[in-house]
């Protein structure tokens, strides 16, 4: 999970649909397209990119509350897998708003030996619960479908990290501007699984020239 710069202007359909009450829809074409663009077509929780099963997720469950249901600031781009796991009651209203707060200030997203370690850096409830959620979307296997979907995300992360490590190796062997740019592109917040790559660089003193690209948004 990384910081997302979300458009401050709510899509017009939300206001229109809210007037319809319970029959209104927050899934208008303008909402879908704006969320897809703002979140770079990746799930805000697991950071899988190019979603085949995108869903519009409410950061705070609306439970029939029309203000929450149609609040642009409460709508996020998610995959079905992460949305289903976050729907556990224990997470209600306890997840970091990555459009207002930089999750990387509060959590380390570590990738080691083909596995993840999501470490909260403070004792705030939102930090603790967000770290737990990210861990669960990669590791929770309490149903048959979750076994498959969690494994798919772990494999996708492993593939992306292997590509990233190869780009770093290429750069170490030849520190050209072209090779540097190839690394920098994968450190952008818009990249797949950016939090894990950015944490990796942030914890490596030998990559001082890349630290400016993984700065935190305080």
Show which residues each predicted segment covers.
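Short, charged surface segments at domain edges that flank catalytic/cofactor-binding sites
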Residues: 1-42, 65-70, 162-169
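Amphipathic, alpha-helical segments enriched in basic
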Residues: 18, 31-34, 50, 54-57, ...
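Histidine-centered nuclease catalytic patch
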Residues: 45-78, 86-107
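DNA major-groove recognition helix of helix-turn-helix/homeodomain DNA-binding modules
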Residues: 82
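Conserved, surface-exposed functional patches that form binding/active-site neighborhoods
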Residues: 90-172
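C-terminal, charged low-complexity interaction regions
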Residues: 135-218
């Amino acid at each position: 999970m990384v910081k997302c710069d979300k458009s401050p202007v709510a899509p017009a359909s939300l206001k229109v649909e809210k007037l319809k009450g319970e029959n209104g829809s927050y899934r208008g074409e303008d909402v879908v397209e704006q969320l897809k663009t703002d979140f770079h077509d990746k799930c805000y929780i697991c950071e899988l990119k190019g979603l085949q099963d995108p869903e519009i997720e409410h950061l705070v469950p609306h439970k029939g509350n029309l203000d929450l249901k149609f609040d642009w600031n409460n709508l996020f781009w998610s995959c079905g897998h992460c949305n289903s796991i976050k729907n556990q009651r224990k997470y209600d209203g306890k997840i970091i708003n990555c459009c207002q707060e930089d999750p990387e200030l509060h959590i380390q997203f570590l990738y080691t030996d083909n596995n993840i370690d999501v470490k909260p850096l403070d004792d705030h409830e939102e930090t603790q619960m967000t770290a737990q959620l990210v861990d669960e979307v990669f590791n929770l296997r309490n149903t048959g479908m979750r076994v498959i979907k969690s494994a798919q995300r772990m494999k996708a992360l492993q593939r992306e990290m292997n590509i990233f490590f190869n780009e770093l190796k290429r750069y170490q062997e030849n520190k050209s501007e072209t090779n540097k740019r190839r690394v920098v592109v994968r450190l952008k917040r818009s990249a797949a699984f950016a939090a894990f790559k950015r944490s990796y660089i942030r914890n490596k003193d030998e990559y001082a020239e890349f630290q400016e690209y993984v700065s935190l948004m305080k």
